[in-house]
Amino acid sequence: MSRIGRKPIQIPDNVNVTVENRQIIVKGPKGQLSYSLPEGIGITIDNKTMLITRESDLSKQRALHGLARSLISNMVTGVSQGFTKALQIYGVGYRAQVSGNKIILNIGYSHPVEFVLPEGIKATVDEKQTTITLHGIDKQLVGQIAANLRAIRPPDAYKGKGIRYTDEVLKLKPGKTGKK
């Protein structure tokens, strides 16, 4: 049996979980998320504890068992606490600004790059305009938006200029060695 799928999910007091026709709806103080259960995967809720079960031991169902448990656990965490992802901008003159639901990036191109944030994602920029912090309740969406922002100007291998995650460690390449 999947070891991840076997773990019970604890439901906080401020989160409400309902199941209707294989559709799980999780409501909390930060918002609401829903997930459609795959075929062969079941759910039992009792006394602020959720347990995910599967009908058979087929390899596809074993894989979906752990996946469903992780996704539902992330939904519960998202609506109660939320998720954040921070990006750091490195480079002389590189900076970011937030205006409404747009992030305006000056990152070495001849024009400022405008990145439109989807609904449910908020962004903040620090005073130095070099750290972008994304906030949201959907872990997958927060991570995808962070990856899309990083892809606009990935870190350079020689100088390290560009957009990277705050916890990302770059191994810089050595430059050319001159003739003597």
From Swiss-Prot:
SUPFAM superfamilies reported for this sequence: Ribosomal protein L6 (SSF56053)
Gene Ontology molecular function: rRNA binding; structural constituent of ribosome
Pfam families from the UniProt entry: Ribosomal_L6 (PF00347)
Keyword line: Ribonucleoprotein, Ribosomal protein, RNA-binding, rRNA-binding
A single GO BP: cytoplasmic translation
UniProt keyword Acyltransferase present: no
GO cellular component terms listed in the entry, alphabetical order: cytosolic large ribosomal subunit
Entry-linked Gene3D superfamilies: Ribosomal protein L6, alpha-beta domain (3.90.930.12)
Entry keyword NAD: no
Assembly and oligomerization: Part of the 50S ribosomal subunit.
Function: This protein binds to the 23S rRNA, and is important in its secondary structure. It is located near the subunit interface in the base of the L7/L12 stalk, and near the tRNA binding site of the peptidyltransferase center.
Family indicated by similarity: Belongs to the universal ribosomal protein uL6 family.
NCBIfam families: L6_bact
Protein name per its UniProtKB record: Large ribosomal subunit protein uL6
Taxonomic path: Bacteria, Pseudomonadati, Nitrospirota, Thermodesulfovibrionia, Thermodesulfovibrionales
Gene name in the database record: rplF
